[in-house]
Structure formats: C-alpha cells, structure tokens
Amino acid sequence: MLVDSFNRVIDYIRVSVTKQCNFRCQYCMPATPLNFFDNEELLPLDNVLEFLKIAIDEGVKKIRITGGEPLLRKGLDEFIAKLHAYNKEVELVLSTNGFLLKKMAKDLKNAGLAQVNVSLDSLKSDRVLKISQKDALKNTLEGIEESLKVGLKLKLNTVVIKSVNDDEILELLEYAKNRHIQIRYIEFMENTHAKSLVKGLKEREILDLIAQKYQIIEAEKPKQGSSKIYTLENGYQFGIIAPHSDDFCQSCNRIRLASDGKICPCLYYQDAIDAKEAIINKDTKNIKRLLKQSVINKPEKNMWNDKNSETPTRAFYYTGG
C-alpha cells in the first residue's frame, strides 16, 4: 500500500502517454506549435506497462490514461489490453477530447477500458472552434454517442470560462442528463501556458446558475477523488471539480506519470522525480523506491486559492491535468 505523509492512501495513477494534442485549447496549450512532436522523449508503452504492473502490485487500483490527447498514441488499445489482462480488478479509464473516439471506442471497450471522460466545453460549433482552435464538435458528439453504443461508461468534463461558455451550463447539463451521463464542471486552473485573458467561474457561481432552474442537494463528497457530487431534485447527479476550495486536496489519492518518465506528486507544483532510466531498464527495485518516494513527496495541498502564490508553470498537456 502507498501512503503519503498526510496519511492519504495513494491508489490512483494518471499516466500521460503523449504530450501531443490535436486541439489548442485556450486554457491549456493555445500557443504551442501545431507541428510539436515529443516522440524522442516518449517512454515505450511496454516499459510503461511494466511500471504500472509494479504500481498495481504496490496497491494501485485505478489507472487513467491521459495526454495531451492519448488517442494519438499508436498501439494504445493493445497496451490497454495487456494492462487489463494483468489485473482485471484494476479500473482502467481514459480522458480524451473525443475527436478520434468514434472510430476507436469499440476497440477500447474490447481491450478492457471501463470508462472514457470526454471534454465538452460547448454545444455550439463556433465556440468549440474558438476554445479549441479546432472545428471539432461534430466529431466529439459522434464519439460520445459511439461510446454509449458500445457500452463504455462515460463522463463529461466542462471547463467553465467566463463570457465564453458560462451561459451554456444548463444546456450542457440537460444534454448530459438526457443521456444519463454525469457531467463535471471544472474550475479553470490558472497556469502560465493558458491565454492570459481566460477567467473561470468558481464553484459557487456555477451552482447559482444551475439553481436558477433546479433545486440542488449536495451529496457527500467521496472519500477519494476530486469531484464534489451534487444531486438534483429529480435524482440526477453532476459534479464540480473545485481546486480553489480549501478541502479540495484532503481526499487526493493520486500521482502522475508523465510521458517522459517523470513521476509528479501534484498537479500544481513543479516538483517531480525522474524515473525514466529505471523504467527503461525495467529496474523493479529502483522503480519501487522512486514510486514510494514520489508518494512521500506529495504536498498537503495546492496553492490555487492563495492569491499571493505564483502561477503554476507546468503545462497540463505534460501531466494530463
């Protein structure tokens, strides 16, 4: 079992398999060149697999595959199948912008993937283009429908941006509710790679907008996980991921493996442990040591709620959010 210095059990790893992305979202990597490549830095998937086997043996119960955009990584379905075959009890999930999901959903499901989380920031094509610099809405919606068709569990993630998509909060809620999908609204997390004009809505503002139509009952916050779950009077549940709140980090149960082999204890802080050499060499003893050290290195909380703190400099496409 992996336990950090604040007695939090760490049983969840987010694994970035690439920094590449086919979107250039305002809140993530708007200025990154479209011909950006990271192939020379990437860990081979077979080596990532061996690392994750060790992590599973140490108590990891959930693995999320992220990017960049993970569906750009070749051989991903085979990688998932091998991971699933090693331990079928481990929950395998994937975060995606959904652009390539329609043609890959069935193979991902057959490989053993349990769930996809799809970014959906708007239901208006022009806004999706403005936010992501990609004419992507049709592809993303088709990917969502195909995922439901093949039997994948699904969640939607929406980053709420002031004066951009905040007037769609209820419309997006209805879209998700009608498909029996949970939507999670995400507070914008300030970072130096985002456009400077991007401003997000906080949890209270999001709730106030939803309360204009629905009576909201706050459900119990999960003992582990980042999302506060709210229940509407009709029983539908949605989530809010609010990193600016004081209790956001209390139940944190995760670490991150970047695509270049660095283990990141926290999304906010730049600190990381370079495990690339150990992973490439499949050095089990050293991997275990570095894994445990990264867990010990986890800070108590982020500093997004501290107005005097520095804006995080690590790119979210590096760690997968």
UniProtKB/Swiss-Prot annotation:
Provide the residue positions that the database annotates as binding [4Fe-4S] cluster 1.
C21, C25, C28
* Pathway of action: Cofactor biosynthesis; molybdopterin biosynthesis
Q: Which UniProt keywords apply?
A: 4Fe-4S, GTP-binding, Iron, Iron-sulfur, Lyase, Metal-binding, Molybdenum cofactor biosynthesis, Nucleotide-binding, S-adenosyl-L-methionine
Q: Broadest EC class?
A: lyase
Q: GO MF annotations for this entry?
A: 4 iron, 4 sulfur cluster binding; cyclic pyranopterin monophosphate synthase activity; GTP 3',8'-cyclase activity; GTP binding; metal ion binding; S-adenosyl-L-methionine binding
Residues that, per the record, bind GTP: R14, R64, S95, K155, R254, I255, R256
Top-rank taxon = Bacteria
Cofactor (UniProt): [4Fe-4S] cluster
Q: Which reaction does it catalyse?
A: GTP + AH2 + S-adenosyl-L-methionine = (8S)-3',8-cyclo-7,8-dihydroguanosine 5'-triphosphate + 5'-deoxyadenosine + L-methionine + A + H(+)
Residue numbers binding S-adenosyl-L-methionine? Y27, G68, S119, M189
Q: Which InterPro entries match?
A: Aldolase_TIM (IPR013785), Elp3/MiaA/NifB-like_rSAM (IPR006638), MoaA (IPR013483), MoaA_NifB_PqqE_Fe-S-bd_CS (IPR000385), MoaA_twitch (IPR010505), MoCo_biosynth_MoaA/MoaC (IPR050105), rSAM (IPR007197)
According to the record, cofactor stoichiometry and binding are noted as:
Binds 2 [4Fe-4S] clusters. Binds 1 [4Fe-4S] cluster coordinated with 3 cysteines and an exchangeable S-adenosyl-L-methionine and 1 [4Fe-4S] cluster coordinated with 3 cysteines and the GTP-derived substrate.
UniProt key word Lyase:
yes
* Chain ranges of the Radical SAM core domain: 5-233
Q: Which parts of the sequence bind [4Fe-4S] cluster 2?
A: C249, C252, C266
Question: Which PROSITE patterns does the annotation name?
Answer: MOAA_NIFB_PQQE (PS01305), RADICAL_SAM (PS51918)
Gene3D superfamilies with a match to the protein in the record: Aldolase class I
Record EC number: 4.1.99.22
Sorted alphabetically, the Gene Ontology BP terms of this entry are: Mo-molybdopterin cofactor biosynthetic process
The UniProt entry's sequence similarity note says: Belongs to the radical SAM superfamily. MoaA family.
Function text: Catalyzes the cyclization of GTP to (8S)-3',8-cyclo-7,8-dihydroguanosine 5'-triphosphate.
Query: Partners and quaternary state?
Result: Monomer and homodimer.
Protein name, per record: GTP 3',8-cyclase
Q: Which organism is it from?
A: Helicobacter pylori (strain ATCC 700392 / 26695)
Instruction: Give the gene that encodes this protein.
Output: moaA
